[in-house]
Amino acid sequence: YNISFNVNTDSSTLIGTDTFRNNQVELRKGSVYRCAEEGGFGIFDEINMAKNDAASVLHATLDHRRMIDVPGYERIDLHPATRFIGTMNYGYAGTRELNEALVSRFLVIDMPALTKENLYRIIRHDYPEIKEEALDAFGGLFLDLQEKADNSEISTKCMDLRGLLSALGAVKIGLTPWQAVQMGIINKAFDIFEREIVSDMAMTRIPEDWTRENVF
């Protein structure tokens, strides 16, 4: 069960809400309710996007009580196979600090920075036909951006793995590598000075005269 959190997420989104069906009021079960009832994995995607009071309804679900109390309906115990996983990008715009009571109910895995070996493995997995020189160029650009971001010289907006992979996909269907990098990486920086820095870094890695044949 995938539950995408946002600023409008509330308890009714997670647990359920009243609905009118067959001439009577019934509970329309939310994703958390169904996961608790049937078992399986519940994925709280971007858990730090929601307001803390929305996530507070999960407290009894996530601690030793392992139950959900639905006002006006019944109290249900969690299926033994129910597990919940929360994901978040700490520090992203629009996110907030997590409630301490909520954090204490999770085991936290801190994802390390992407290494060169893992980055190349991901790129090769999605684009096995990529040439070695292009792999070094695109992978090297991402690692350069990662180093700049770690040193607080640029923001993390351009250090976008999805953008890098999308740029390669755009090259595959006909864009020049430079155009693809502009749209997938450079233009993610909305500050003009930061964009110039990222553009200069890209120029050192991706020649403007490259074509699709230089990449695939």
What is each stretch, according to the model?
Residues 1-143, 150, 176, 204, ...:
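AAA+ P-loop NTPase catalytic core and its hallmark functional loops
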Residues 115, 124-216:
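Alpha-helical lid/collar subdomain of P-loop NTPases
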